[in-house]
Amino acid sequence: AKIEQIVGWLKGVYADKPAVIAVSGGVDSAVALTLLVLALGKDKVIPICLPYGKQDMADARLIIEFNELKDKMIEINIEAVVEEMARLVVAEEGSVRKGNIMARTRMIVVFDLAKKLGAMVCGTENKSEHHLGYFTRFGDAASDVEPIAGLYKTEVWEMAKILGIPEIFYTKEPSAGLWEGQTDEAEMGFSYKDADLVL
């Protein structure tokens, strides 16, 4: 029922406009992308991959192929922009500041492409991240539409299973994809399962 509810809501919000969505290879963007395709159809959804340097985008490509959107994918490497910005403001490698610069650079690219394509930006924020403050203001939290903002992380995993999304998306460790080996739970110091029990 929750899926139908979100899909119906997305149809109403987007009307005839296309959607752009940054696809990272994590479960949040996988679920949001799949819901968008169910709501708007493949013709109206443009997935955007924004790797940093040699960042592995295999899972992002996997969910894009799962939704049969390979031909519509836009890929832009953000490394040069991030490095220049980090150099200008002297943000250290692996720091929260550098991570924020990455998230905000992705936001700039996604909103610019939305403007170019006459589209609305679909976000991938979940309720757990929001309550925990685990996001970058004006970065990954910036969007026009947030289809999974009402779902806790544990509910996002459940929805991924129901949608038939490949298992890798709900079995791997969640990561914001900011640097090598970075995981949400290591940064927060607790698991989403534990957090959701409290939230």
Where are the model-predicted features located?
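Short alpha-helical "packing" element that flanks the helix-turn-helix/winged-helix DNA-binding module
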Residues: 194-199
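Catalytic subdomain that performs nucleotidyl-dependent activation
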Residues: 65, 97-106, 119-191
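ATP-dependent adenylation/nucleotidyltransferase module used to activate substrates
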Residues: 1-132
